[in-house]
UniProtKB/Swiss-Prot annotation:
Name this polypeptide is given: 5-hydroxymethyl-dUMP N-hydrolase
Pfam entry (one): Nuc_deoxyrib_tr
Gene that encodes it: Dnph1
Origin organism lineage: Eukaryota, Metazoa, Chordata, Craniata, Vertebrata
PANTHER family the UniProt entry points to: 2'-DEOXYNUCLEOSIDE 5'-PHOSPHATE N-HYDROLASE 1
EC number(s) reported in the record: 3.2.2.-
Subunit (UniProt): Monomer and homodimer.
Amino acid sequence: MAASGELVPCSVYFCGSIRGGREDQALYSRIVSRLRRYGKVLTEHVADAELEPRGEEAAGGDQFIHERDLAWLRQADVVVAEVTQPSLGVGYELGRAVALGKPILCLFRPQSGRVLSAMIRGAADGSRFQVWDYAEEEVETMLHRYFEAYLPQGTASSSNPSACLNPTVLEKI
């Protein structure tokens, strides 16, 4: 248990495209690097420059990857997704995160020329599910803004899906 005033790190599930395209890999690396300031990033491999567009070659195949990633998603306190590069996997992860009641931040770059799916933008409720437009040079600032608002002091263990998030500010962002 953390002492009063001590920040307890989050378990963060980061979503980014793998098989849908690796064009944003360098950006994912910046995001994961920043997310490490706020807690343990369970899905650091998404940012790995060595990860091929066809995905990782796990010993148990696709089923193993699915089960492992769902276990990480259940463990996570918060989900952060870069949703500019369309990805069926990221959409699936977000749907599962919603079903699990996880707080979600989706980041989208309108300057990409893409249009974000209505199923993502339309899910935003300004509270548990947030979609923020940003420019690439703002990514660290956006993450800082989100976690500064959501991370309370002296929170409990990550067995609670919202343990590292401050519920008193959910409506204020």
